[in-house]
Curated annotation (Swiss-Prot):
Coiled coil: none annotated. The lineage of its organism: Bacteria, Bacillati, Bacillota, Bacilli, Bacillales. Pfam families: Com_YlbF. It comes from the Bacteria. This is UPF0342 protein Sca_1419. Belongs to the UPF0342 family.
Length: 114
């Protein structure tokens, strides 16, 4: 009987949705959305991050003015308790993803380990 990897992936998705890490992100993001200033800061910061990622992917230089704006946004975010909680929760989930990724790529690592 063939192993259905997509089926296992869906089970992993369900497990992630039921994890404490996911629930912590969801709760923290709900708090950010409930506070207008937090939501505004968060949205602006994400927009800046996406802009920088697109520029890097296209090989464009990031302007000094844009870097300064991003630094100011980061400082404002660090002071926002709601966003700080969300970022901490995201960090925890990122750790989970790293651990899962190590497990997933282990078979390939073993193939090339000689």
């Amino acid at each position: 009987m063939a192993v259905n990897l997509q089926e296992h992936a869906h089970k992993l998705e369900d497990a992630l949705r039921n994890s404490e890490e996911y629930k912590a992100i969801k709760d923290a993001y709900d708090k950010v959305k409930a506070h207008e200033e937090s939501k505004k800061l968060f949205d602006e910061f994400r927009e800046t991050q996406l802009k920088f990622q697109q520029m890097q992917m296209q090989g464009e230089q990031i302007e000094e003015e844009d870097l300064k704006k991003a630094q100011e946004q980061a400082q404002a975010i660090e002071k926002d308790e709601n966003i700080a909680e969300l970022m901490a929760a995201e960090q925890q989930m990122s750790q989970v993803f790293q651990e899962i990724n190590q497990i997933i790529v282990k078979p390939l690592d073993e193939v090339y380990a000689d």
